[in-house]
Amino acid sequence: MSDPSMTSDGATTHSGFVAIVGKPNVGKSTLLNSFLGTKVAPTSPRPQTTRRGVRGISTTDTHQIVFVDTPGLHKPKDALGKYMNHEVHSALADVDVIIWVVDLRHPPTDEDELVARQVRELPKPLFLVGNKTDAAKYPDEAMKLYRAQLEGRSAETSEIMLSAQNNPLQVATLREQILDILPENPFFYPRGAASDQSRETWAAEIIREEAMKKLREELPYAVATRVNRWTEREDGLQRIEGEIVVEKNAHKGMVIGSGGKQLREIGQAARKQLEVFLDRKVFLGLEVIVIPGWREDEEALRELGYE
């Protein structure tokens, strides 16, 4: 019987799970997408864009990294927020390596301390990644403050600083350092896999990303998305039917906009993204529905995939 931790030519394989953690809006999802060279996680300038733990997979001949992009750790205000924090705690319990991303434009906040408290005692290698150095006035001084939050940590800790655009050489350096410490294991996913998300979940997240970019004030946080149907015509056209879910009828009108303008703009932007990544023509049909108080309704959360 062949050894699952060896390649066909007898080389030993290494693989492991790497959690990317940090407070909201520090660049975790952008870093994940940079590692993979493709988009598997939604990004936007707004905090709490990521709600689920998203797994992105990077495989070489002998190594496989399973990155776990996590929601920003924060003080939850509703059942959705509690779910998001649970995703972080679950990821940290099951991974081999931790990446803590911090924003060097600002000194540590209470939310950063929440993250530090989680990772300080974990006996796992940790990379402290100082992000957005090119936009920071005093990046070295800020890095010292974040480093101080890990005081007393006994497990191995390394540091790296990244520009806001995630310079490819900097990202490659960090990736090589992770590869060097992966444990000996068989691969967890097939070669060529980029993510464990279903295509429906991935498309729904792209729709939500575009909605978050377009909508104002607190409304983006009261929006969820799902894809109910995805079919392919003989000519290759991808027909995707999705829903944007809001909590109130007033919100529905705001998402649709005057004469349907806002909804059309969200749909057009999402369709363009989908066409680029799928390399196919896409028809995207969107409907706005109301599920009252869905962020506090555990059954509704499960129906929307937050489980």
Swiss-Prot record:
The lineage of its organism: Bacteria, Thermotogati, Deinococcota, Deinococci, Deinococcales. Residues 131-134 are annotated as: G4. Residues 69-72 are annotated as: G3. This is GTPase Era. The keyword RNA-binding applies. PANTHER family: GTPASE ERA, GTPASE ERA, MITOCHONDRIAL. Residues 162-164 are annotated as: G5. HAMAP family: GTPase_Era. It is a peripheral membrane protein. Gene3D superfamilies: 3.30.300.20, P-loop containing nucleotide triphosphate hydrolases. Residues 215-292 form the KH type-2 domain. Residues 22-29 are annotated as: G1. Residues 48-52 are annotated as: G2. Keywords: Cell membrane, Cytoplasm, GTP-binding, Membrane, Nucleotide-binding, Ribosome biogenesis, RNA-binding, rRNA-binding. It is found in: Cytoplasm; Cell membrane. Monomer. GO terms for molecular function: GTP binding; GTPase activity; ribosomal small subunit binding; small ribosomal subunit rRNA binding. GO terms for cellular component: cytosol; plasma membrane. The keyword rRNA-binding applies. It comes from Deinococcus deserti (strain DSM 17065 / CIP 109153 / LMG 22923 / VCD115). An essential GTPase that binds both GDP and GTP, with rapid nucleotide exchange. Plays a role in 16S rRNA processing and 30S ribosomal subunit biogenesis and possibly also in cell cycle regulation and energy metabolism. GO terms for biological process: ribosomal small subunit assembly. Residues 14-184 form the Era-type G domain.
